[in-house]
Design a protein with these regions (language model features):
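Short, well-ordered coil/turn segments that N-cap beta-strands
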Residues: 1-4, 29-31, 57-65, 91-93, ...
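Short, acidic/polar
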Residues: 13-26, 76-86, 125-132
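Glycine-rich, proline-tolerant flexible connector loops at the mouths of alpha/beta enzymes
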Residues: 27, 31-53
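Conserved beta-strand positions in the central sheet of alpha/beta enzyme cores
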Residues: 33-34, 95-96, 141-144
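Short, small-residue-enriched loops and turns at beta-alpha junctions
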Residues: 12-13, 40-44, 71-77, 103, ...
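Active-site mouth loops of central-metabolism enzymes
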Residues: 1-19, 68-79
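Alpha-helix-loop-beta-strand connector modules within alpha/beta enzyme cores
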Residues: 44-70, 108-122, 158
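Catalytic alpha/beta core domains of metabolic enzymes, predominantly
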Residues: 101, 105-108, 114-158
Length: 158
């Protein structure tokens, strides 16, 4: 499955700038959006409003939306790994887990009733997937993806 994706950072750009960027990248054939909740420092309601607006617009353009999260995000927004409804409410098609879970949590999340994709960051530790598989996840909802965002030292060494 070959798809082109783009990264957006709502804490670094205005909603209007992001919408313009998504329109341009949509015209160029991109169909996947990677959005980041890791560095957002706003109240939950403000996050929900902003991300919902951006993600709704992205869906209108035909994008699939994946939101990057970590255990810290779950804690700060009071989200349980057994209840991922917050992410569905903001229009995410899936969440990308950077690190910090044991394997059991990721496995449980793959059975979420919101039908969200659970994507693992394969750039951190390729053995993470083995640990998750030990807990018998729903393999149809478990994806692996390497870093593709343009931050120095965020990709794999050659």
């Amino acid at each position: 499955m070959r798809r082109l994706g783009v990264s957006i950072y709502p804490e670094k750009s205005t909603v209007e700038e992001i919408k313009n960027y998504l329109e341009e990248t949509s015209r160029l054939g991109f169909s996947r959006v990677f959005s980041c909740l890791l560095s957002v420092n706003k109240p939950a309601e403000e996050i929900k409003k902003e991300f919902t607006e951006i993600n709704t617009f992205a869906h209108e353009l035909g994008f699939e939306v994946i939101v990057d999260v970590s255990p810290r995000v779950f804690g700060e927004l009071n989200i349980s790994y057994k209840d991922l409804s917050f992410f569905k409410e903001i229009g995410a098609d899936g969440i990308r887990l950077d690190a910090g879970f044991s394997g059991l949590e990721e496995s449980i999340m793959t059975y979420n009733p919101e039908n969200l994709i659970i994507e693992i960051n394969m750039s951190n530790n390729v053995h993470t997937i083995d640990t998750i598989m030990d807990y018998r996840p729903n393999k149809y909802k478990l994806y692996g993806c390497h870093n593709f965002y343009p931050h120095r030292y965020s990709g794999l060494n050659l």
